[in-house]
Every structure is written in C-alpha cells, then in structure tokens.
A protein has these predicted regions:
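Conserved acetyl-CoA pyrophosphate-binding loop and the N-cap/start of the following alpha-helix
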Residues: 87-100
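A conserved beta-turn-beta hairpin within the catalytic core of GNAT-like acetyltransferases
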Residues: 69-79, 89, 133
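Conserved acetyl-CoA-binding loop of GNAT-fold acetyltransferases
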Residues: 102, 126-135
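Short hydrophobic clusters on alpha-helical segments that form packing/core surfaces
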Residues: 101-105, 121
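Conserved GNAT acetyl-CoA-binding A-motif
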Residues: 105-116
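Conserved GNAT-fold acetyl-CoA-binding loop/helix
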Residues: 18-40, 48
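A short beta-loop-alpha structural element at the N-terminal edge
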Residues: 1-15
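Conserved beta-strand in the GNAT
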Residues: 50-52, 59-69, 78, 83
Length: 142
C-alpha cells in the first residue's frame, strides 16, 4: 500500500534510510540522528511532498520525498531522496512510489534529482524516463 508520507511515518523512513544507505553499494556511514535531521529538513521544506510504501504489517518498504520549486511559470519537482528496502529492490516498488508521487503532484512536468553516475540507481531512473541533463552540471566547493 502506498500512502502520503506524514511526520508520523518519518521515524520509520529514517531507520530504513540508515539501513539502506549504510549497505552496499552505497556504503555510507549514516547514524539515526543525522538521517533524522536530513529527512526532517527535507520534510519541513515548503511545498514538500512524499509517499511511502507499506507492507501488510505496516512496515515501510520504501519512500520518496522532495519538494516543488517555481521556475518561471512552472513548478518543478526536486526528488531529494528515494529509498527502497534492499531486499525489495528490483521488484517494482521504486517505480510504484514514483508513479504514486506523480499522481499526487498532478500536472508537474519537470522533475530532477541527483544520483551517482553509472550506478544501479542511475540505470533505474533512466529506465523509467529520466535522462542526464545535457547542459547542467554539478559543481562542488571544497
């Protein structure tokens, strides 16, 4: 079952986030406090929208979270985080999450996100219609 993400469901998403992104292929080093801060900040962003997938016992299988931004006369959606339980990946849960989020957002045509190049995640996003932005690049400052 896919539902709208609420503040009540954020703690379960935090646990899933830590579990998923600390495991291969990401191998990051998240703790609960930092992940809660990150997801809480995203959730508190004006015009934030998210969905989560639950199994029949109410356990979170995945979630997607981002926010709308105005660009000219259109709204664009920045998908800030998406996470699917490792054991459930490759079974359509990510696609269903993004379809539900698209239905929730209505007529928003432009979405964007950041992910690792040449990764399973980037391959997933390309399979469902995302493409690398030809003119855009990511710049970082040390």
């Amino acid at each position: 079952m896919i539902t709208t993400l609420t503040s009540d469901g954020l703690d379960a998403c935090v646990s899933l986030y830590v579990e998923t992104f600390n495991a291969p292929p990401w191998n990051e080093s998240w703790n609960v406090q930092d992940a809660a801060q990150r997801l809480g900040d995203f959730f508190a962003t004006p015009r934030a929208h998210g969905v989560c997938s639950l199994n029949s016992h109410g356990d979170v299988l995945g979630f997607a979270l981002g926010h709308l931004e105005r660009s000219g006369v259109d709204d664009h959606f920045l998908l800030q985080e998406m996470c699917v339980r490792t054991s459930m990946q490759g079974k359509g849960h990510g696609t269903l999450l993004l379809e539900a989020l698209a239905d929730h957002l209505g007529q928003v045509r432009h979405w964007y996100l950041l992910t690792a190049r040449d990764s399973d995640a980037s391959a997933f996003y390309e399979r469902i219609g995302f493409r690398p932005a030809g003119r855009m690049g990511v710049f970082v400052r040390p």
